[in-house]
C-alpha cells in the first residue's frame, strides 16, 4: 500500500506507515494505529523525525496539530489551570509563544478566582490571543527540536 505520515494525538509523535491496499487516505483523516484491528493501516514502519516529513506533510502539519489541540481542548485547559514553574525563574506558561510575564500573571490571577472552562473563557478572562493557535505554535517548536523543554511532545 501507499506510504503515509501520521501525527499521534497524545504526544504528537510522527510516524510512517503503509495503508491497506486500495484505500486512499486524505490529510486530516483519523486512523487507528493501536495493536489490534487496524482498518486503514497495515504496517507501522516506525517513528520519524520532523526533518523526515515530506514537503506535503509539512504544509498540512500546522492545521492537523491545531485540529488535535481543539479536539483535546479539556486536556489543554487543564494544563492552563494547573501549570507550575519549571525553574525558580521560568514558568511553564512562559514557554508558550506569545505568553510573557504579563500574560502569565493574568492567567495565574484569573485561574485563582475560578479555573478556566474552555479556550474561549481563557481568551476572554486572561485577555490572550487564540490559545489553540499559541499551543499549536509551541507544539510545532517542540516537534522541530527548537526547544529545550517539552510540555506536550515526546522526544523522537
Located regions from the model:
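Structure-specific DNA junction-binding interface
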Residues: 1-70
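C-terminal extensions
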Residues: 67-95, 109-156
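Small-residue hinge/turn detector
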Residues: 100-101
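Conserved hydrophobic/aromatic packing and binding residues within compact polymer-binding modules
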Residues: 104-107
Amino acid at each position: 500500500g501507499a506510504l503515509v505520515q501520521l501525527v499521534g494525538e497524545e504526544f504528537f509523535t510522527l510516524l510512517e506507515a503503509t495503508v491497506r491496499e486500495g484505500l486512499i487516505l486524505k490529510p486530516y483523516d483519523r486512523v487507528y494505529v493501536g495493536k489490534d484491528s487496524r482498518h486503514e493501516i497495515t504496517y507501522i514502519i516506525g517513528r520519524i523525525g520532523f526533518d523526515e516529513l515530506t514537503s506535503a506533510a509539512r504544509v498540512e502539519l500546522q492545521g492537523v496539530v491545531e485540529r488535535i489541540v481543539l479536539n483535546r481542548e479539556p486536556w489543554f485547559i487543564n494544563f492552563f489551570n494547573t501549570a507550575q514553574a519549571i525553574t525558580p525563574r521560568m514558568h511553564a506558561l512562559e514557554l508558550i509563544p506569545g505568553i510573557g510575564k504579563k500574560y502569565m500573571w493574568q492567567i495565574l490571577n484569573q485561574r485563582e478566582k475560578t479555573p478556566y472552562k474552555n479556550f474561549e473563557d481563557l481568551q476572554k478572562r486572561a485577555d490572550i490571543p487564540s490559545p489553540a493557535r499559541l499551543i499549536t505554535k509551541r507544539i510545532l517548536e517542540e516537534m522541530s527540536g527548537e526547544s529545550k523543554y517539552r510540555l506536550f511532545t515526546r522526544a523522537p
